[in-house]
A protein has these predicted regions:
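Long, compositionally biased, intrinsically disordered regions
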Residues: 25-388
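N-terminal single-pass transmembrane signal-anchor helix
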Residues: 1-29
């Protein structure tokens, strides 16, 4: 009898414990399931949006190449190149329209409206397929460089990467007053390969007579297992903000950046060269064509300069290199080298559009390989639901 009563008491306690556990656990399980469903819905939406960005050409199909650019005339957003056989190949003109420093930019809010993403936020970024770190030093007659190629994911060195290097220098002689006191020279490319540490180094010895090197760049076209990227090494990083370079179709546009660097003086364009993965091709040389000289200043009517080169879009150069004559504080009159249209000096991240993700919101991350100007990049979409 006592044993039976004891058994009933134990059973009641066990049932009570199960009931309490169920009451506590079911909401947690339900909440977990709801969170999982919400995250899956977020990923599905991000996937659809990412494909729309990368696979759709938008409307009109050449919206990034139209000059003058009016974002209100863009009826549908998409970055794809207008070719049915070019899946995940992006139009560089459209990508450049995402640059906030571009004189013809499409704003983030406008893209949100075109994609009907009023309840969501996103950031679209482009990265190199691998990391590249470099150094470049000059003497009066010699340019020396070194570079290291590593995996972006974990920093593992990449041996046997092909590094094709094309040099260009500017040089001067005293008294640095006349145009003849400044010259620019480009050189045939040289090919190197990284060792077991992912590194390689080389040098260029010049013979410029009475001229001494002032500035130098090394355009490094790096190929790993069929994937390639271009990095531009230079001996003076601060000069990169002297001018803003954009291309749209066959047209090159130069403008002043928002944050001027070192000088507010005029920029005189002395030479323009285009890099096509093999060589530097001269497009413009001051005095050779009309107009004989080109300049941009902060004066009214001179803040922008554009010139068209028929066939430029077909050539699709990865780098445009400009020799600019400027007057720098503490240096005086000099001839510098500026590259564009993208940021080629960064080792990893090349471009980002949109605000940084908010840490309190669940974020879906999507990545795809894309091609821009015949170079492979990792595109990344960070996608989240905005707080109500």
């Amino acid at each position: 009898m006592v044993s039976a009563a004891y058994d009933h008491m134990v059973a009641i306690v066990i049932v009570g414990m199960i009931f309490v556990a169920t009451v506590v656990a079911l909401p947690a399980i339900s909440y977990s399931n709801m969170a999982t469903v919400d995250q899956q819905q977020l990923r599905n939406t991000a996937y659809s949006v990412f494909d729309a960005m990368l696979l759709d050409v938008g409307s009109p199909s050449n919206w990034g190449s139209n000059l003058p650019f009016d974002p209100n005339k863009v009826e549908k957003f998409g970055l794809a190149y207008a070719d049915p056989f070019s899946k995940f190949v992006l139009d560089s003109d459209k990508v450049q329209r995402l640059d906030p420093a571009n004189p013809g930019v499409i704003e983030y809010d406008r893209v949100v409206d075109l994609l009907n993403l009023e309840e969501y936020g996103f950031q679209l970024s482009f990265y190199r397929p691998f990391s590249v770190n470099w150094t470049l030093d000059i003497t009066n007659t010699v340019v020396r460089f070194s570079t290291t190629v590593t995996r972006s994911e974990d920093g593992t060195p990449i041996p046997n990467a092909e590094v094709r290097v094309t040099f260009m220098v500017t040089a001067s002689k005293l008294p640095k007053q006349d145009d003849g006191d400044f010259i620019s020279e480009k050189y045939d490319p040289k090919t190197y390969y990284t060792n077991v540490t992912g590194s390689c180094a080389g040098f260029l010895s010049t013979n410029l007579g009475e001229y001494n090197i002032d500035y130098a760049v090394a355009i490094m076209h790096i190929t790993v297992a069929g994937l390639s990227t271009t990095v531009l090494a230079q001996n003076a990083n601060p000069i990169t903000n002297l001018i803003k370079i954009n291309t749209f179709g066959d047209t090159i546009t130069l403008s002043f950046p928002d944050n001027l660097n070192d000088t507010n003086s005029e920029r005189r364009i002395k030479e323009i060269d285009a890099y096509d993965f093999k060589n530097l091709m001269r497009l413009f040389k001051a005095g050779d064509v009309n107009p004989p000289e080109v300049k941009i200043t902060k004066g009214s009517g001179y803040e922008y300069w554009s010139i068209s080169f028929p066939g430029l879009r077909a050539v699709n150069p990865s780098v445009l290199l400009f020799a600019l004559q400027v007057t720098l504080k503490g240096i005086g009159r000099t001839l510098v080298l500026i590259a564009g249209p993208f940021s080629f000096g960064d080792s990893e991240k090349v471009f980002a559009f949109g605000p940084d993700p908010q840490s309190e919101n669940p974020i879906a991350i999507m990545r795809r390989l894309v091609v821009i100007s015949d170079m492979t990049y990792i595109s990344q979409l960070a996608f989240w639901r905005e707080q109500a």
